[in-house]
């Protein structure tokens, strides 16, 4: 046990362990790992679908009682024990080694599909250097006499995404072929990641200044431009208008808790690895609070930026809807051109409905409400590659804004990949399973190459379906289980008193009552509640996916299909296999200890001198 005034007995264990050049590198690395694509395309969606400003109430409650306490534990144990995820948990208890292996496994799986998202971003980024943008118009059909029917039915942006980028199949069972343009982008992405992590924190520490700070510059530029566009005020009003009644819905609280959990990248092992390179007496409490608050403020900042642009898109779509209706009225009733303005349209329509309802009823008039267009938001890739991309399309200088947007997404994803790869590479070195003569550059290259080969399946025509499966099942339940085991392991196995002594030694201040209560009671209860809620949701949800099928009668809506049986088995395996490391390693350690005791007992019996007997 480390005393506040004593020497650290662990410092000499790894004197040669690399250290950050300065504190800013460490903070930016943790922020870059935590602040990822989810801050841009998931939090704004949750905020606007769950009561606007009302969603911030459960969000910040989850931040205070779940996110920050768990984050503090990870930074503290990484800094104190100076090891990666596997080494930390083996040091705390050999029976908890499975937690580290589980975190390692999830980081590996997430790295596979996360870098695939980056290849999509890279493809759009490269195509943004064209004028006009390639998704601004439909291509001509084979006869060169009209436009491709699929594009006319779905829209230019959706067609470019689903057909010209993914070339997606209409069923997950039809794997299709490798899309070579995506394959080359995958090569470029993994090469970029390798060059950035080739020397661990020595190389990522240099790159992180750009990858972590550039997104904030672009968000600020977009915010300034967005606030000057028509409809920005309506978008922000729609986003933050509170609906307090929605707080009665338990799903809102679950989504808030899970968003905090995944947004901070808890239980991946990356933060433990980053903290292990700190000076032993660094103030990790201040770091945990600072990074967590920056992460949450970034989510809010991104939401304001995104919905200022989305308000412009909705206003633009609303205006075009009115223009189409006005044109129909002018053609039907022989009004002079430009005789009906958008402001006059409601009163003119009301008059015609009262005087000539039969003629009006025959017209293909659409119902135009600004709120309906604001409702057409999306989460995940749908926001980045379809909704927001279409919004940028209507902005003056669209190519410039597209380059900035996808450049921002690429740097966001790249800095998150640094943390994922640290969660994979650092434990491998800490386990000492490799010959000491193997250079770090070689080992890092082998890991990146294995990840690249494993991720080739995502470049198939059915690859996006598989990415959705990995995104939905590979991390969610596993990380919740690992986080719960982290709290239990530190508080009840390592010992709360010993842990508090260590923190006092590192920071010079003993953890307050708030920290101890959240670690002992609140955070474990919240994690257990999230785990049960996830199990219930999985049991209630149908094992289905939405396919892009031009032959579907309701196209361009995506057709809902059930996963084949073998795919459902894959989903179950992804959900629980990494977690099986926990009982598996504990059982193996138990058997090992039992075998050792059995050997020692028999050895003692064999060496014990036999009593002399009389004649």
Swiss-Prot record:
Glycans are attached at residues 143, 167, 353. It is found in: Apical cell membrane; Cell membrane. It is a multi-pass membrane protein. GO terms for cellular component: apical plasma membrane; brush border membrane; plasma membrane. Disulfide bonds: none annotated. Signal peptide: none annotated. Keywords: Amino-acid transport, Cell membrane, Glycoprotein, Membrane, Neurotransmitter transport, Symport, Transmembrane, Transmembrane helix, Transport. InterPro entries: B0AT3_SLC6sbd, Na/ntran_symport, Neutral_aa_SLC6, SNS_sf. It comes from the Eukaryota. GO terms for biological process: amino acid transmembrane transport; amino acid transport; hyperosmotic response; neurotransmitter transport; neutral amino acid transport; renal amino acid absorption; sodium ion transmembrane transport. Induction: By renal osmotic stress. Pfam families: SNF. It catalyses: L-alanine(out) + chloride(out) + 2 Na(+)(out) = L-alanine(in) + chloride(in) + 2 Na(+)(in); glycine(out) + chloride(out) + 2 Na(+)(out) = glycine(in) + chloride(in) + 2 Na(+)(in); L-methionine(out) + chloride(out) + 2 Na(+)(out) = L-methionine(in) + chloride(in) + 2 Na(+)(in); L-valine(out) + chloride(out) + 2 Na(+)(out) = L-valine(in) + chloride(in) + 2 Na(+)(in). PROSITE patterns: NA_NEUROTRAN_SYMP_1, NA_NEUROTRAN_SYMP_2, NA_NEUROTRAN_SYMP_3. GO terms for molecular function: neutral L-amino acid transmembrane transporter activity; neutral L-amino acid:sodium:chloride symporter activity. Residues 48-52, 127-177, 228-255, 312-397, 464-472, 542-571 are extracellular. Kidney-specific expression. Belongs to the sodium:neurotransmitter symporter (SNF) (TC 2.A.22) family. SLC6A18 subfamily. Symporter that transports one amino acid molecule together with two sodium and one chloride ions in kidneys and plays a role in the neutral amino acids reabsorption. Preferentially transports neutral amino acids such as L-glycine and L-alanine but also other neutral amino acids. Required CLTRN for cell surface expression and for its amino acid transporter activity. The transport mechanism is pH-independent. This is Sodium-dependent neutral amino acid transporter B(0)AT3. The gene is Slc6a18.
């Amino acid at each position: 046990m480390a005393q506040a005034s004593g020497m650290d007995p662990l410092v000499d264990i790894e004197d040669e362990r690399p250290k950050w050049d300065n504190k800013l590198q460490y903070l930016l690395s943790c922020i870059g790992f935590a602040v990822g694509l989810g801050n841009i395309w998931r939090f704004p969606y949750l905020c606007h679908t769950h009561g606007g400003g009302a969603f911030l109430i459960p969000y910040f409650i989850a931040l205070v009682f779940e996110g920050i306490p768990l984050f503090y534990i990870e930074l503290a144990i990484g800094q104190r024990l100076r090891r990666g995820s596997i080494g930390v948990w083996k040091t705390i208890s050999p029976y908890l080694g499975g937690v580290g292996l589980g975190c390692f496994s999830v980081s590996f799986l997430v790295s596979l599909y996360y870098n695939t998202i980056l290849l999509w971003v890279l493809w759009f980024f490269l195509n943004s250097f064209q004028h006009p943008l390639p998704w601004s118009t439909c291509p001509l059909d084979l006869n060169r006499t009209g436009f491709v029917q699929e594009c006319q039915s779905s829209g230019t942006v959706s067609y470019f995404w689903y057909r010209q980028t993914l070339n997606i199949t209409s069923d997950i069972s039809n794997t299709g072929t490798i899309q070579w343009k995506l394959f080359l982008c995958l090569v470029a992405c993994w090469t970029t990641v390798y060059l950035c992590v080739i020397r661990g924190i020595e190389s990522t520490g240099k790159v992180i200044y750009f990858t972590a700070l550039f997104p904030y510059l672009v968000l600020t530029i977009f915010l300034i431009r967005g606030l000057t566009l028509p409809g920005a005020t309506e978008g922000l009003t729609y986003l933050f208008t509170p609906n307090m009644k929605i707080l009665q819905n338990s799903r809102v609280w679950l989504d808030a808790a899970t968003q905090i959990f995944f947004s901070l990248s808890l239980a991946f092992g990356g933060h433990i690895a980053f903290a292990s390179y700190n000076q032993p007496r660094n103030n990790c409490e201040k770091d945990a609070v600072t990074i967590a608050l920056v992460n949450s403020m970034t989510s809010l900042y991104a939401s304001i930026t995104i919905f200022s642009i989305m308000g412009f898109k909705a206003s633009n779509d609303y205006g075009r809807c009115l223009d189409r209706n006005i044109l129909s009225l002018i053609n039907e009733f022989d009004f002079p051109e430009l005789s009906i303005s958008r402001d006059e349209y409601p009163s003119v329509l009301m008059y015609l409905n009262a005087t000539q309802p039969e003629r009006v009823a025959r017209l293909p008039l659409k119902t135009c409400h600004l709120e309906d267009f604001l409702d057409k938001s999306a989460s995940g890739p749908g926001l980045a590659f379809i909704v927001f991309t279409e919004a940028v399309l209507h902005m003056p200088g669209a190519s410039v804004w597209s380059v900035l947007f996808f450049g921002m997404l690429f740097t966001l994803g790249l800095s998150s990949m640094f943390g994922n790869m640290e969660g994979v590479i650092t434990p491998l070195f800490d386990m000492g399973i490799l010959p000491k003569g193997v250079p770090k550059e070689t080992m890092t290259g082998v890991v990146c190459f294995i990840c690249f080969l494993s991720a080739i399946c995502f470049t198939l025509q059915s690859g996006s379906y598989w990415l959705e499966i990995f995104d939905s099942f590979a991390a969610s339940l596993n990380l919740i289980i690992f986080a719960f085991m982290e709290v239990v392991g530190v508080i009840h196995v390592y010992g709360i008193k010993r842990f508090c002594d260590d923190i006092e030694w590192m920071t010079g201040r003993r953890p307050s009552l708030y920290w101890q209560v959240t670690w002992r009671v609140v955070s474990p209860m919240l994690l257990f509640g999230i785990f049960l809620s996830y199990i219930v949701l999985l049991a209630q949800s149908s094992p289905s996916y939405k396919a892009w099928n031009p032959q579907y009668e309701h196209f361009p809506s995506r057709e809902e299909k059930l996963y084949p049986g073998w795919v459902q088995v894959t989903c179950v395996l992804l959900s629980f296999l990494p977690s099986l490391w926990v009982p598996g390693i504990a059982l193996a350690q138990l058997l090992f200890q039992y075998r050792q005791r059995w050997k020692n007992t028999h050895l003692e019996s064999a060496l014990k001198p036999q009593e002399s007997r009389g004649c």
